[in-house]
């Protein structure tokens, strides 16, 4: 099981995916709850790897996870450039607009909720794609 983690100052995206790319969990949590939530997810899903975005607050979160998690799990940093734009498109694939909202061009639509969890999904997918190229 792989945990995707999109760390942020105010909120964080989390996702859990199996190695066959089945999505088991995704959620946006406030940053203060992220560590406890990750701890719980590691127990609930037997997480083998944490995949995390490499921008903004990544280094401090990597240190915090390495220090404070009660389980030893490898942390892999993945390039997260353009992931927010990609996540916006993915949101509309996962939750197609209804009614008159369908008439608005996709590039002009804004998701009605934070999409950090979808970024976490994309980080896992990027990691798996890189891994499959390397084997």
Specify the residue positions occupied by each region the protein language model found.
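Phosphate- and other anionic-substrate recognition elements at nucleic-acid/protein interfaces
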Residues: 1-5, 9-135
